């Protein structure tokens, strides 16, 4: 993260004035809409498109070059792509991301474990983060995810991944907080934490164009969400973290405060850099600023897989305009973390909180 600080001013200028022209540092690639779950908070599996082939991904990654710092592979269920290992290999060889993040529902345990091990081996200079999606405990999780036995399969996958002994592999658990589980969140957190994941993260269920959930009542009330997040933050504050984990948790606490503020005030609390520093490629090659709006900046197929041809196009500028003018707001975690990195105020607050925590720990030991 430290190496990103010198680029802050450049990205602020890109957002405000359109120059210098910069590539995204945070890129999400949705490799498929197909999914073997039927979640109550997501309808993405209903979308039918002609997915990018491995060759098309390779051409796109070649055109991107080594600009991407954080690469997220999402779906649908990414591990329904039998060529997921080759997609990751191409991304690593062409883009050299420092972080490759993959989300999974954990259903295809053996294939996921085998694939992740190969991805880790093929990407020695990248940190590989695999997050298992777990929204409830036992049969309640199966009900939310629409698959009988999903909970047991997810835990089997978690244990298998956790047994892999690689220094560049992090295995976490991710919970979507929705109206279907918010009342039970403290128990969910305590139970899942027993498995000692490398990280535990949450995100609020949202109406997203990408997920086909516009107009659906899936989110908890603001009061319910705030109560759940306040509980989580207290638990995080009472745990001791060192090194990079301390920095990560400090940013996470800051994000949860930011998410609450955005939902309360219904505005961009921090300037949003979606479409500037972060972007998403859909399974059919459309480039979006973000998955909430899912407005196409252009079609990579029609652009000959030339990322910059789409990214610096007039259509891309038109998609960025309402974001720059703060005509939208959301607590989308992926975009929010990069927004926080572009805010000197937020960075100062994070460092202040880390220092205060260190002083408190020192005084407690004394």
Task: Describe the residue ranges of each PLM region.
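Conserved alpha-helical substructure of the radical SAM core
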Residues: 2-127, 220-224, 343, 366
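Short, intrinsically disordered, charge-biased short linear motifs at domain edges
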Residues: 20-30, 255-261, 311-321
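Flexible mid-to-C-terminal extensions adjoining Fe-S/redox cofactors in radical SAM and related proteins
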Residues: 269, 284-366
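Secreted/processed peptides and extracellular or luminal domains of membrane proteins
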Residues: 41, 45-48, 278, 296, ...
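Alpha-helical membrane-targeting segments
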Residues: 1-24, 240-264, 336-366
């Amino acid at each position: 993260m430290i190496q990103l600080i010198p680029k802050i001013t450049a990205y602020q200028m890109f957002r405000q004035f359109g120059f210098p022209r910069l590539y995204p540092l945070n890129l999400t690639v949705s490799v498929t809409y197909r999914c073997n779950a039927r979640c109550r908070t997501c309808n993405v599996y209903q979308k039918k498109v002609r997915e990018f082939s491995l060759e098309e991904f390779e051409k796109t990654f070649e055109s991107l070059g080594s600009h991407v710092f954080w690469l997220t592979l999402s779906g649908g269920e990414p591990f329904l792509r039998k060529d997921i290992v080759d997609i990751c290999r191409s991304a690593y060889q062409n883009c050299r991301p420092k972080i490759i993040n993959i989300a999974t529902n954990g259903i295809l345990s053996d294939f996921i474990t085998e694939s992740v091990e190969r991805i880790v081996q093929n990407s020695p200079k990248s940190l590989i983060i695999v997050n298992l999606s777990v929204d409830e405990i036992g049969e309640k999780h199966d009900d939310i995810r629409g698959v009988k036995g999903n909970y047991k399969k997810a835990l089997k996958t978690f244990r298998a991944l956790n047994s892999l002994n690689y220094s560049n592999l992090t295995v976490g658990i991710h919970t979507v907080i929705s109206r279907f589980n918010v009342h039970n969140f403290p128990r969910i957190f305590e139970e899942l934490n027993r498995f000692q994941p490398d990280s535990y993260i949450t995100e609020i269920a949202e109406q997203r164009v990408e997920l086909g959930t516009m107009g659906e009542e899936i989110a908890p009330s603001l009061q319910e969400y705030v109560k759940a997040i306040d509980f989580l933050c207290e638990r995080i504050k009472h745990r001791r973290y060192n090194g990079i984990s301390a920095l990560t948790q400090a940013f996470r606490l800051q994000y949860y405060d930011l998410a609450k503020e955005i939902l309360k005030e219904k505005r961009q609390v921090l300037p949003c850099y979606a479409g500037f520093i972060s972007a998403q490629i859909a399974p059919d090659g459309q480039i979006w600023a973000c998955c909430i709006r899912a407005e196409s900046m252009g079609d990579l197929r029609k652009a000959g897989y030339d990322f910059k041809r789409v990214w610096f196009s007039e259509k891309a500028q038109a998609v960025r305009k309402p974001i720059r003018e703060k005509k939208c707001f959301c607590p989308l975690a992926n975009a929010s973390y990069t927004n926080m990195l572009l805010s000197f105020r937020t960075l100062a607050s994070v460092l202040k909180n880390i220092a205060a925590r260190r002083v408190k720990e020192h005084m407690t030991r004394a």
